[in-house]
Amino acid sequence: MAGTDSPAAARFVYRCLLFAPAIVVGLLLPLTLPPIAAAQRHTASDNPSTYNIGGVLSNSESETYFHTIISHLNFDQQYVPRKVTYYDKTIRMDKNPIKTVFNVCDKLIENRVYAVVVSHEQTSGDLSPAAVSYTSGFYSIPVIGISSRDAAFSDKNIHVSFLRTVPPYYHQADVWLEMLSHFAYTKVIIIHSSDTDGRAILGRFQTTSQTYYDDVDVRATVELIVEFEPKLESFTEHLIDMKTAQSRVYLMYASTEDAQVIFRDAGEYNMTGEGHVWIVTEQALFANNTPDGVLGLQLEHAHSDKGHIRDSVYVLASAIKEMISNETIAEAPKDCGDSAVNWESGKRLFQYLKSRNITGETGQVAFDDNGDRIYAGYDVINIREHQKKHVVGKFSYDSMRAKMRMNINDSEIIWPGKQNRKPEGIMIPTHLKVLTIEEKPFVYVRRMGDDEFRCEPDERPCPLFNATDSTANEYCCRGYCIDLLIELSKRINFTYDLALSPDGQFGHYLLRNNSGAMTLRKEWTGLMGELVNERADMIVAPLTINPERAEYIEFSKPFKYQGITILEKKPSRSSTLVSFLQPFSNTLWILVMVSVHVVALVLYLLDRFSPFGRFKLSHSDSNEEKALNLSSAVWFAWGVLLNSGIGEGTPRSFSARVLGMVWAGFAMIIVASYTANLAAFLVLERPKTKLSGINDARLRNTMENLTCATVKGSSVDMYFRRQVELSNMYRTMEANNYATAEQAIQDVKKGKLMAFIWDSSRLEYEASKDCELVTAGELFGRSGYGVGLQKGSPWTDSVTLAILEFHESGFMEKLDKQWIFHGHVQQNCELFEKTPNTLGLKNMAGVFILVGVGIAGGVGLIIIEVIYKKHQVKKQKRLDIARHAADKWRGTIEKRKTIRASLAMQRQYNVGLNSTHPPGTISLAVDKRRYPRLGQRLGPERAWPGDAADVLRTRRPYELGKPGQSPKVMGATPAMLGRTRPQQNILPPRYSPGYTSDVSHLVV
């Protein structure tokens, strides 16, 4: 055992434990430890009530704190269920890993520990924690490390049940990516050792960057990878390769000893001074020769053993509590000598531990699939003079977004060379002064507020230097040209200072007197003047390439091809409250309204005078149906026109119904025409532009009511000067020219300027942004935008080649889509709009003729109906007269028969009463006082027997005979009785004696 204390023996044991843990534990332990009975298993309802938590700690202070935390845990109901108690079992970490293995078996596993918390001194190496992990993992007992950060513990094939509350060293690659994104560095050189941790951090960086840069605009690429063997003696050979690379940003993972060698040799090559950026891991920060300006990372709570002990205990308690509520926990193994023990509950407990996510003393505690701590916080350290470490930022957990966030105060960073300005991070042979000008969408300019100290990530500072004032006004610029400048600076490796045009002009040349002499000289203004007079190195702006400018400056190949076009405002169309009436002309609307009421009136008249306007079903007891009144006719006409349901008041006559069908057809055509024309007003295009293009006669011969203009001193202004055929037009528009394109566009929108002639790119952008604007005609004066440089500039070819590559790679097309077509809120409007013609009487005359034909047809039909009805009435009258005559004749015949029968019965009756006289000799007289009607017909004195027939017909059956005797017995037939008409009850006639012409007998 003594030999294992030497460094060589320790390395040997470490390799044995690393590659053959099963051999060491499986062969050594059974030979040295007595066999112990296998662990007993509990049923599903027998979860243990006591849980022993083991601790392999590095000092007595940690042991005491571990015991205290376990004691306090038992009173925390949030983590400990009822009737559950935790106990601590601790041992001291031994530097000898073999002794550590025996101690774990004898003092921890023997006491049935359910998990082990392990810590060790940072200077003692990771052999002893590895031994604890091997031994516990063999029996599936979870191990929680609070200080081990080597990458080897992430290998679950070896450390099957190990997790830790500290992140491994190679997780610092995640922080590197955040820092590179913050500083916008695009090329880096990675320096790492060839051990497990060094290669792990390289792999982590490469793997994470593939997904990380999907969410950010700035992508960092690894230009060079430098790998070295640990225990360096010299790093000079690698520095030579690094010096020839373009990147000046170095990401280094090295131990403290190796970092000292690297910093020493880099200082000799002047690679730790101005313009270089060093970002290192924690170990390198502790080198005694770390250069000023180096940025490094330091894990928060890295040396807080108490905080990690507490977090590990509470993570374990949280996992056990959830496991108790979900499943049965078998007792922990107790025998290190039984290699057949398979504690499934330990494997399940390890899974529960990995799923924990709690807020502890060391921050947000959570684990990845390898059991490594995630959401660990880091301090960003800046090395100052005399090796002072200054915190300039933090990488911490954002609980609102549930992810990590980088926050760095750039103003507090001292960069290598004691510079306050952030290095560009690449090799820059020349620093250029670049000028630009505000021109949407190529350059947007925003003035910085008083409380702003830097521009937005997509902006670049572009101060405006006034010739009359030494101070600069701070502005921020972004846009098409700014992105082009950024990409150019990356591609051909130059840095720049960006500024705005001093006078806000592109520039044109003027003839000026030379010091009061008679000679004149040409002098350029604006951007051109700055470049010609060598006060600027480059112009990156929508600068049109033309012969006048090309004579004095160099142009690159065009980065944007365009031409000249005309911008005008579309004819406005007012919208009123009666806009819905626009599909029809006023005349047509009036005719439709009149037609509705005329048709209603005609329907009423047809139904009123039609003989069939009212009818009644045969054999029906219901009253006859009412005819269509005027109100119902109007309702019917409007209902048909507006396609509403007609529930009542419909025409009854055939003539009116024919008109109703014709009216329905008219309404269908009117409504369909109105609907179609209304849709045309809503969705079809407006009228075309007023101008057809530059060759429009109204432009060539400008009228007073048509004003056009451009920007004075611009390339368009020069184009009109060169074109002889446009000289007349130019003389007219010269007085109207504007100082800037922005002013002219605003006047076009207000209607003060009819036509603005300018570059097509800008005008198409404005037209696509505002539907009230439109470009007229085809392009003319085709040219392009180029990057301007000084005459003979060595950068011309490099810029030209870079722009050609941008065209081939699609970068320029990307800028077009981003800034010209999609750089603003697009309006869904077309280039032109057409207004449909308003429908008039001429268009709809056929419909009204159809209505007239319907009305005439209805009138004709009613005339035919009236004539036919008259003929029918005459025929019916003749039939009624004949029927009446026949009925009267029949009645007379029946009356006579009745009288004769009555007389015969009376005679028979009288014979029965007065047998002295025969029936034929007896005469009857009726008292007219009792029967006044008979008296009137017989005269003032007597009523004759024949005139009593009416009275006899009215007599009841019992009056014609004896009581109870039917009329048949008395000689009266049922037919005779049936022809009697109803009369009032009258008394039977009283016959009194009277005289006749024959006085031979007495009349009673």
From Swiss-Prot:
<keyword id="KW-0812">Transmembrane</keyword>
<dbReference type="GO" id="GO:0045211">
    <property type="term" value="C:postsynaptic membrane"/>
</dbReference>
<keyword id="KW-0460">Magnesium</keyword>
<feature type="binding site">
    <location>
        <position position="549"/>
    </location>
    <ligand>
        <name>glycine</name>
    </ligand>
</feature>
<keyword id="KW-1071">Ligand-gated ion channel</keyword>
<dbReference type="GO" id="GO:0048149">
    <property type="term" value="P:behavioral response to ethanol"/>
</dbReference>
<dbReference type="GO" id="GO:0042391">
    <property type="term" value="P:regulation of membrane potential"/>
</dbReference>
<feature type="glycosylation site" description="N-linked (GlcNAc...) asparagine">
    <location>
        <position position="270"/>
    </location>
</feature>
<keyword id="KW-1015">Disulfide bond</keyword>
<dbReference type="GO" id="GO:0055074">
    <property type="term" value="P:calcium ion homeostasis"/>
</dbReference>
<keyword id="KW-0106">Calcium</keyword>
<protein>
    <recommendedName>
        <fullName>Glutamate [NMDA] receptor subunit 1</fullName>
    </recommendedName>
</protein>
<dbReference type="GO" id="GO:0014069">
    <property type="term" value="C:postsynaptic density"/>
</dbReference>
<keyword id="KW-0675">Receptor</keyword>
<feature type="binding site">
    <location>
        <begin position="542"/>
        <end position="544"/>
    </location>
    <ligand>
        <name>glycine</name>
    </ligand>
</feature>
<feature type="transmembrane region" description="Helical">
    <location>
        <begin position="664"/>
        <end position="684"/>
    </location>
</feature>
<dbReference type="GO" id="GO:0017146">
    <property type="term" value="C:NMDA selective glutamate receptor complex"/>
</dbReference>
<dbReference type="InterPro" id="IPR049873">
    <property type="entry name" value="NMDA1-like_N"/>
</dbReference>
<dbReference type="GO" id="GO:0042331">
    <property type="term" value="P:phototaxis"/>
</dbReference>
<keyword id="KW-1003">Cell membrane</keyword>
<dbReference type="GO" id="GO:0007268">
    <property type="term" value="P:chemical synaptic transmission"/>
</dbReference>
<dbReference type="GO" id="GO:0072375">
    <property type="term" value="P:medium-term memory"/>
</dbReference>
<keyword id="KW-0732">Signal</keyword>
<comment type="subunit">
    <text>Forms a heteromeric NMDA channel with Nmdar2.</text>
</comment>
<keyword id="KW-0770">Synapse</keyword>
<feature type="topological domain" description="Extracellular">
    <location>
        <begin position="685"/>
        <end position="843"/>
    </location>
</feature>
<feature type="compositionally biased region" description="Polar residues">
    <location>
        <begin position="994"/>
        <end position="1004"/>
    </location>
</feature>
<keyword id="KW-0597">Phosphoprotein</keyword>
<feature type="binding site">
    <location>
        <position position="759"/>
    </location>
    <ligand>
        <name>glycine</name>
    </ligand>
</feature>
<keyword id="KW-0813">Transport</keyword>
<feature type="glycosylation site" description="N-linked (GlcNAc...) asparagine">
    <location>
        <position position="493"/>
    </location>
</feature>
<comment type="similarity">
    <text>Belongs to the glutamate-gated ion channel (TC 1.A.10.1) family.</text>
</comment>
<dbReference type="GO" id="GO:0035235">
    <property type="term" value="P:ionotropic glutamate receptor signaling pathway"/>
</dbReference>
<feature type="glycosylation site" description="N-linked (GlcNAc...) asparagine">
    <location>
        <position position="409"/>
    </location>
</feature>
<feature type="region of interest" description="Disordered">
    <location>
        <begin position="980"/>
        <end position="1004"/>
    </location>
</feature>
<dbReference type="Pfam" id="PF00060">
    <property type="entry name" value="Lig_chan"/>
</dbReference>
<feature type="topological domain" description="Cytoplasmic">
    <location>
        <begin position="865"/>
        <end position="1004"/>
    </location>
</feature>
<dbReference type="InterPro" id="IPR028082">
    <property type="entry name" value="Peripla_BP_I"/>
</dbReference>
<dbReference type="Pfam" id="PF10613">
    <property type="entry name" value="Lig_chan-Glu_bd"/>
</dbReference>
<feature type="glycosylation site" description="N-linked (GlcNAc...) asparagine">
    <location>
        <position position="705"/>
    </location>
</feature>
<feature type="transmembrane region" description="Helical">
    <location>
        <begin position="586"/>
        <end position="606"/>
    </location>
</feature>
<comment type="function">
    <text>NMDA receptor subtype of glutamate-gated ion channels with high calcium permeability and voltage-dependent sensitivity to magnesium. Mediated by glycine. This protein plays a key role in synaptic plasticity, synaptogenesis, excitotoxicity, memory acquisition and learning. It mediates neuronal functions in glutamate neurotransmission. Is involved in the cell surface targeting of NMDA receptors. Plays a role in associative learning and in long-term memory consolidation.</text>
</comment>
